């Protein structure tokens, strides 16, 4: 009741599902997760599953897990091991309408592939994990993409995680202002 209209909360699934169980036999864990999230009702935005580094691609495990996810929600996957960043995974996500998280982490930028009706971005830091401030040129590059996605009717969720020295809030505010300045009338932005 205290958030503005149109505001949604993104959630990140617990590492018990992604790092410990590695998407295997997770029905009970998924049920528990959604029992907690149901209080958000229409304010529930995408749920992120961040898979660990050094866990190699396992298409069949991912396929089984995706089938177990409840319908009517938005999900995104962030793959930290580069072996997952392949067309077969993108196709599997797209077939389920699940987003591929585009991310930037200490100089590595994942492929940017639209696999859903929304885009999910995590910016973890330009110089190292969770550190450094994004410069105007880099932000402008993201803004151009975001405006294009918004014009095409996609929702965009962008999160800054470069919070070690407090840069995340400033970068997010700057990006939001840049998106608003570059978005034509009639295209809704998250700020209104």
Kindly give the residue locations of the regions a language model identified.
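Residues lining hydrophobic/aromatic ligand-binding pockets adjacent to catalytic sites
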Residues: 1-192
């Amino acid at each position: 009741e205290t958030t503005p209209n149109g505001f949604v909360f993104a959630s990140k699934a617990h590492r018990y599902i992604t790092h410990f169980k590695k998407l295997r036999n997770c029905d009970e864990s998924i049920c528990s997760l959604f029992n907690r999230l149901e209080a958000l009702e229409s304010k529930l935005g995408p749920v992120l599953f961040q898979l660990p580094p050094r866990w190699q691609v396992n298409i069949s495990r991912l396929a089984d897990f995706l089938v177990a996810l409840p319908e009517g929600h938005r999900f995104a996957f962030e793959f930290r091991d580069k072996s997952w960043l392949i067309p077969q995974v993108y196709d599997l996500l797209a077939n389920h309408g699940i987003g591929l998280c585009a991310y930037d982490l200490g100089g590595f930028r994942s492929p940017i592939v639209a696999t859903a009706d929304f885009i999910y971005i995590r910016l973890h830091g330009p110089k190292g994990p969770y550190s450094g401030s994004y410069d105007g040129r880099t932000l402008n590059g993201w803004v151009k993409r975001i405006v294009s996605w918004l014009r095409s009717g996609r929702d965009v969720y962008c999160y800054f995680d470069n919070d070690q020295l407090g840069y995340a809030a400033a970068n997010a505010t700057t990006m939001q202002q840049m998106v608003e300045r570059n978005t034509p009338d009639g295209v809704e932005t998250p700020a209104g």
